[in-house]
Amino acid sequence: EVCSEQAETGPCRAMISRWYFDVTEGKCAPFFYGGCGGNRNNFDTEEYCMAVCGSVMSQSLRKTTREPLTRDPVKL
């Protein structure tokens, strides 16, 4: 999955400002791209990053969200 890949600068040395989706934070974050190599989690704008990967956050929340535990009152 594109959106779960780590930010990867690549082997070149350009300092191109790009965005990647950070699954830990559940949002897009800036990073510097070297200009070659790298991976597909590399977007020109934050808006485009969120358009592609924003649903990943809601899908992962649905998988990890559980019903709250209900407890019977303790009787002494």
Curated annotation (Swiss-Prot):
Xref: InterPro entries: Kunitz_BPTI, Kunitz_BPTI_sf, Prtase_inh_Kunz-CS, TFPI/VKTCI-like
Keywords: Amyloid, Cell membrane, Cell projection, Coated pit, Cytoplasmic vesicle, Disulfide bond, Endosome, Membrane, Protease inhibitor, Serine protease inhibitor
Protein location: Cell membrane; Membrane; Perikaryon; Cell projection, Growth cone
Gene Ontology annotations for the cellular component aspect, listed alphabetically: clathrin-coated pit; early endosome; extracellular space; Golgi-associated vesicle; growth cone; perikaryon; plasma membrane; recycling endosome
Highest taxon of source: Eukaryota
Keyword flag Cell membrane: yes
UniProt short sequence motif OX-2, positions renumbered to this chain: 56-76
Domain BPTI/Kunitz inhibitor per the UniProt entry, residue ranges: 1-76
Chief location bin: membrane
Annotated disulfide bonds: C3-C53, C12-C36, C28-C49
Pfam (any one): Kunitz_BPTI
One GO BP annotation of this record: cognition
CDD domains assigned: Kunitz_ABPP-like
Bilayer disposition of the protein: Single-pass type I membrane protein
Site positions per UniProt: Reactive bond: R13, A14
Protein's UniProt keywords contain Cell membrane: yes
Quaternary organization: Binds, via its C-terminus, to the PID domain of several cytoplasmic proteins, including APBB family members, the APBA family, MAPK8IP1, SHC1 and NUMB and DAB1. Binding to DAB1 inhibits its serine phosphorylation. Interacts (via NPXY motif) with DAB2 (via PID domain); the interaction is impaired by tyrosine phosphorylation of the NPXY motif. Also interacts with GPCR-like protein BPP, APPBP1, IB1, KNS2 (via its TPR domains), APPBP2 (via BaSS) and DDB1. In vitro, it binds MAPT via the MT-binding domains. Associates with microtubules in the presence of ATP and in a kinesin-dependent manner.
Family: Belongs to the APP family.
Function: Functions as a cell surface receptor and performs physiological functions on the surface of neurons relevant to neurite growth, neuronal adhesion and axonogenesis. Interaction between APP molecules on neighboring cells promotes synaptogenesis. Involved in cell mobility and transcription regulation through protein-protein interactions. Can promote transcription activation through binding to APBB1-KAT5 and inhibit Notch signaling through interaction with Numb. Couples to apoptosis-inducing pathways such as those mediated by G(o) and JIP. Inhibits G(o)-alpha ATPase activity.
Recorded domain comment: The OX-2 motif shows some similarity to a region in the N-terminus of CD200/MOX2.
Name of the molecule in the record: Amyloid-beta precursor protein
Organism: Macaca mulatta
